[in-house]
Amino acid sequence: MSAQNPVLTPEKRGEDVDSALRPQTLDDFTGQAEARANLKIFIEAAKNRGEALDHVLFVGPPGLGKTTLAQIMAKELGVNFRSTSGPVIAKAGDLAALLTNLEERDVLFIDEIHRLSPAVEEILYPAMEDFQLDLIIGEGPAARSVKIDLSKFTLVAATTRLGLLTTPLRDRFGIPVRLSFYTVEELELIVRRGARLMGLGMTDDGAREIARRARGTPRIAGRLLRRVRDFAEVARAPAVTREIADEALTRLLVDNMGLDQLDTRYLTMIAVNFGGGPVGIETIAAGLSEPRDAIEDIIEPYMIQQGFIQRTPRGRVLTAIAWKHLGLMPPKDMEAAQFRLTLEDDD
């Protein structure tokens, strides 16, 4: 289990499922401008032709709106939306049950599609390409192959780790969409909208303070907003100001860059124990007593985006930004060493 601060994990939690705060249309959705513009065109074209939308693959860190976009797509297409995740589909029969219940042009959303088992993935290939199920009924000499026709549907899938998808599966998605971290300005709009829907007073600098510490992730911004609201209500404040937001987030151990204790431990360990790196991911995982996947999927994407670390062939290396944030002096030969590592990376 990860020791990351629960309010900063981008993974989905029960309190995050608040349909009232979710945008309902692509026009309401903030951020990801290029992806939204393209999706609008693809949806309009599919509706004009009366066809199912081509299969869509969302790629990006958790908490950026992949599930929300899938729901919006179904709504704008005027079709049913069904949702599941890779780990839930344990057997080929589970997938067959889902697919045979879909109606014409329905949207099926599979989160964490990289966690599908190979046996289930094999069933998915003909379903995506030919809208047919190829099932083996029975065992041994009595086994026979049965083909079942499916309604033409749209598979919308999401993954945080594109490299774990097999090439045959990846190639069957006609519309790949990569989502990126949000800017502070975009998150500020999301925080203001959330506060308005909650009936919560919010000053401009209060919204900006929350947005600044939300790690570029709307899900985290929403969670921080709910926690700051708790502090504001108990203090009987008429509105969330920068001072209230700062006090609340500091008490929640979220620093001014959105880092928590685990993030700081990560950076400090590389700085103090390994002289700023390079250090391998397995060594970092052992030192933090955290699973490698949690470090690669949750901690590092934001670190890289903010310029705190570099990934090199020899391991992770702290940048000058990280040393400054920690308040530590980097090694004198750091710049020369990083230049050599960059050259190796280019090779």
Swiss-Prot record:
Keywords (alphabetical) are: ATP-binding, Cytoplasm, DNA damage, DNA recombination, DNA repair, DNA-binding, Hydrolase, Nucleotide-binding
Q: Which CDD domains match?
A: AAA
Q: What does UniProt give as GO cellular component?
A: cytoplasm; Holliday junction resolvase complex
Question: What is this enzyme's EC?
Answer: 3.6.4.-
**Binding of DNA, residues:** 292, 311, 316
- Among its keywords, does the record have Nucleotide-binding? yes
GO biological process, any: DNA recombination
Gene Ontology MF terms: ATP binding; ATP hydrolysis activity; four-way junction DNA binding; four-way junction helicase activity
Per UniProt, subcellular location reads as:
Cytoplasm
Q: Which reaction does it catalyse?
A: ATP + H2O = ADP + phosphate + H(+)
Segments for region (Large ATPase domain (RuvB-L)): 1-182
Provide the binding site for Mg(2+).
67
Q: Which domain of life is it from?
A: Bacteria
- Where are the annotated segments for Small ATPAse domain (RuvB-S)? 183-253
Q: Which residues participate in ATP binding? A: 21-22, 63, 66-68, 129-131, 172, 182, 219
Family of the protein in this entry: Belongs to the RuvB family.
Q: Which PANTHER family match?
A: HOLLIDAY JUNCTION BRANCH MIGRATION COMPLEX SUBUNIT RUVB (PTHR42848:SF1), PTHR42848
Q: What is known of its domains?
A: Has 3 domains, the large (RuvB-L) and small ATPase (RuvB-S) domains and the C-terminal head (RuvB-H) domain. The head domain binds DNA, while the ATPase domains jointly bind ATP, ADP or are empty depending on the state of the subunit in the translocation cycle. During a single DNA translocation step the structure of each domain remains the same, but their relative positions change.
Q: What is this protein called?
A: Holliday junction branch migration complex subunit RuvB
Species source reads: Allorhizobium ampelinum (strain ATCC BAA-846 / DSM 112012 / S4) (Agrobacterium vitis (strain S4))
Organism lineage reads as: Bacteria, Pseudomonadati, Pseudomonadota, Alphaproteobacteria, Hyphomicrobiales
Q: Which gene encodes it?
A: ruvB
